[in-house]
Amino acid sequence: MLIAVVGKAGVGKTTVLQYIADYFHFPVFFADRFIHQQYANGQAGYAIVKQQFGAQFVNHEAVDRKQLAQYVFNQPDELKRLSNLTKPLVQEWLNQLKAQFQDKIALVEIAVMLNYWNDYRPFFDEVIQIERDAKIVKQALKARGVDVEQVQKLIADPTYPILTVINNSTVAECALHVTQFLESIAKSDKCHHGHYQTPK
């Protein structure tokens, strides 16, 4: 069973999921990290960027992610084109994960799903959205040295009802709420998660 975890930049998705992986031992995967792996020389993502955007965006080791990001983030049509070109890679990866976790729970952080709901939703059994107070989000993004307004526009607002977990307190508290939801799934007839640990 695959559970998608979505939310805008700065809400703490990665931190919460890493906490869940470390302390509750759920398998956790990150779509962004998968794409970054695909950007290595010799991988499909590297070839796509080089062929479709030009050799100036790659070096002998990998895609120059910083240069590519500066280019596509300032041109929405090009960002959409990049997303559409890499989408089949992500979908094939999700197919593999879905086959691997038919009777166990795994979580996948995939924020871009909110932009391409119909393309990614069929791969997941459930969806969890992480939200956070706007002031905390801005502080988190500024600490990362990114353009707050630009980054917040990258991910669309949800257009469908999604279970939402608020991350305004501690990472542990947010992770607890998520794992309580996962526990309810594990206890249902949908799947069996052999290594689940009940939050204390």
From Swiss-Prot:
Catalytic activity: 3'-dephospho-CoA + ATP = ADP + CoA + H(+)
Coiled coil regions, renumbered to chain: none
Pfam families: CoaE
InterPro entries: Depp_CoAkinase, P-loop_NTPase
GO cellular component terms, semicolon-separated: cytoplasm
Ranges where the DPCK domain occurs: 2-200
NCBIfam families assigned: dephospho-CoA kinase (TIGR00152)
Family according to the record: Belongs to the CoaE family.
Name under which the protein is recorded: Dephospho-CoA kinase
Gene: coaE
